[in-house]
Amino acid sequence: MRRAVCPGSFDPITNGHLDIVIRASKLFDEVVVAVSINKNKATLFTIDERMELIREAVRNHPMAPSNVVVDASHGLVVDFCRARGIQSIVKGLRAVSDFDYELQMAQMNNSLAGVETLFMSTNPQYAFLSSSLVKEVARYGGDVSHLVPDVVLKQLRERAVE
């Protein structure tokens, strides 16, 4: 079985993230969305909330792929891959600046565990999009309805004003 992981903090998942996950689901038998837990990083949503938002976003997507699963990830992505027999990491690239960092990570992951990284170019309509930017715009009352899945929108608005 061809399996891949899409790692990230997904705080919250954006339409850009979802686009990469859906596209990856067409290329692999199973795609695991690995939601990272970093105790040193403050998040707007808890790990359980982020995982449930991702599950609902995938379930509510018009394609609703059945080969996407969501799991929590502690530590190195390559350790997550090794423990689950996953051979590939899928990463979305928004800009050349993303590539510089992600290439170094891909080479390190390959040297540590022989895990390959597949880079997918982001849909141009999401090239500027990041969870941090979405949270910032929402915090100031801006319209982010076109940037996040519907299931995320209500919770994001409630949390962003707290």
From Swiss-Prot:
Site (Transition state stabilizer): 17
UniProt: substrate binding residues: 9, 41, 77, 91
UniProt entry tagged with the keyword Transcription regulation: no
GO biological process: coenzyme A biosynthetic process
Reactions catalysed according to its record: (R)-4'-phosphopantetheine + ATP + H(+) = 3'-dephospho-CoA + diphosphate
MF (Gene Ontology): ATP binding; pantetheine-phosphate adenylyltransferase activity
Principal subcellular localisation of the protein: cytoplasm
InterPro entries given in the database record: Cyt_trans-like, PPAT, Rossmann-like_a/b/a_fold
Subcellular locations according to the entry: Cytoplasm
EC number: 2.7.7.3
UniProt family annotation: Belongs to the bacterial CoaD family.
Subunit structure: Homohexamer.
Known function: Reversibly transfers an adenylyl group from ATP to 4'-phosphopantetheine, yielding dephospho-CoA (dPCoA) and pyrophosphate.
PANTHER family from the UniProt entry: PHOSPHOPANTETHEINE ADENYLYLTRANSFERASE (PTHR21342:SF1)
Protein name: Phosphopantetheine adenylyltransferase
